[in-house]
Structures are given as C-alpha cells and as structure tokens.
C-alpha cells in the first residue's frame, strides 16, 4: 500500500531533521581542527589543564639508542672524514655505545627519573651484550620505535605508502621480538619523514609520534589511517644538533635545558589558567653519555626535580594521561 501524503511529509521532515543533526555533530567533531602546514592533515590542539599531581610542565628525556654502522653516523671532526679508516670519528661514535649507554641508564636510575628510549630495531641483535646490560639497569624504560637503523636502513620515503607501512611493521615486529614490548610510539630515523610516514605509522598501530617540533602543547593529527598524538620534540633541545652543528658544549646545554624548562614553569606560575605544556628532550650517548655530558645532565635533572610544577615522566605516561582525559 502506498504511503499517504502526510506520512511522506512527516518522513521527509524526520529525514531532514536527522540530516541537520548529523551535520551539526560533524561540525562539532571537527571543531578546532586546522590543516597541519607540513602534511595538510587536520590537526587539533589538545588542551591539558594539568598533569598528574597538579603539575603544569611535563618533561621527558628521550634517549636515542641507535645503529649507525661502521663509517656512518655523526662526526665530531668533519675535517677527518676522508681518512680511511677514520679512527677519530669512528671511536667517537663507539665510545658513546660502549660507555655512554650504560652511563645514561645509571644516571636516570640513580636519580629515580623515568627514561624513554628511542630504539633502532637492529640494535639488540647487533649489540646484545650492551642492550642486556642497559635493560638490567633500565627494565621499565618506555620503548619508542626508531626505525631499523639510522643510516643505511632509514624510511623508504621514495617508494610510496605501502613500502613505508611494511617498513614500520617490520620495525615494530623486530622490536617486539627483541624486547618483548610492541612500541606504541614512533620517532623517525634522523627525523627524516614525509607525509606518507604519518599515515603508515597510524596504519601499523602507532598511537603517538615525536615527529612534531612546532608546539609546547599536545595535538592530534588526523591521518587517513587514524589519529596520532603528537608529542612536542623541539629541535632546539636536542643535544646532538646543538653539540655537533652549533658547537655547544655540555655546560651550555645545561643552561639551555634549564632555561627552557624554567621559563615554561615561570609562564605557568604567572598565568595558572594557561594550558599545561610538555617538552620531550632528545639525548644521545656520544654527547650526554660522556662524563662531562652526564655531569651537565645530572645537574639539570637535580634542578628541575625540585620544581613543584614539573612532572618528570616518560612518553608512554604522557600518552596514557592524554588518552584518559
């Protein structure tokens, strides 16, 4: 039996009302999004009123445990790279691995400060004795996937989205096999990524990324494969760039890190209603893992541990707190 005119009109009105509600809901859901200037994906600020314990500044140190390979990696003396073999730069890198990794682990354990580790997936198999020793010192450190290695097996940026998905999946599988933990965070090798990287990491189950350098606050990046929590990782706070590219010695890094954190604390004190901030500070064994580097880092940690508004934490805890908001 055909519907009456009244029924048809009522149904049309109901459909129109439902459509309007859906459109309003969609507008509400996307409210606050803006295009990310690099990827073009929608990005939304995540406002955190405070961190656990009414803290206002979250600080996490990300320790890079990487595979470079013989003849690859950062150079302390660029004027000597043409030597064959280049003993000075090779031993500079090896010192960081042989001595610096455990030194950093001991420092954070002794001060009872959480540590996050950005791990090259090939490291545990290539240097098992060093990895075993470090994990005995730091059994609970958060593990962030940092690609296969940092030189010859970086992201296949020119090969398309699918190739990056395979690479990310392989990295996660290998880390899980070696460490027993499947990372939920990602930091691209040498911070060298492209628009496909964000989509690929989300597709492979990554929940947060350190490939974000443009804010003091958390944000959510909406990729075609799902969302990523973007944790601020300012380029100016990374020890390697400051040390090797700008010739900043550890005592200068000490001043930089202290000033950076304390200014965020000061801003929170003068404006208690402003959103809570976060900074992930990148450290490397051949810079911060030297005796002078560790001494400078120790003084920084001792100083900011005294601040009642600072939450010294790890990246997994930042993600968990943001997720629970």
Q: Could you tell me what each predicted segment is?
A:
Residues 33-53, 173-177, 181-274:
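Active-site-adjacent pocket scaffolds in enzyme catalytic domains
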Residues 22-34:
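N-terminal signal peptide
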Residues 40-46, 110-112, 138, 208, ...:
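C-terminal domain-boundary segment and adjacent tail
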Residues 159-166, 248-252, 292, 296:
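Alpha-helix N-cap and loop-to-helix initiation/capping positions
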Residues 97, 101, 127, 164, ...:
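Aromatic/hydrophobic pocket-lining residues that form the small-molecule binding cavity
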Residues 33-140, 150, 300-303, 309:
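Active-site beta->alpha N-cap acidic-glycine motif
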Residues 83-85, 102-105, 110-194, 226-227, ...:
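Metal-dependent polysaccharide deacetylase catalytic core of the NodB/CE4 family, i.e.
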Residues 1-19:
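Classical eukaryotic N-terminal signal peptides for Sec-dependent ER targeting/secretion
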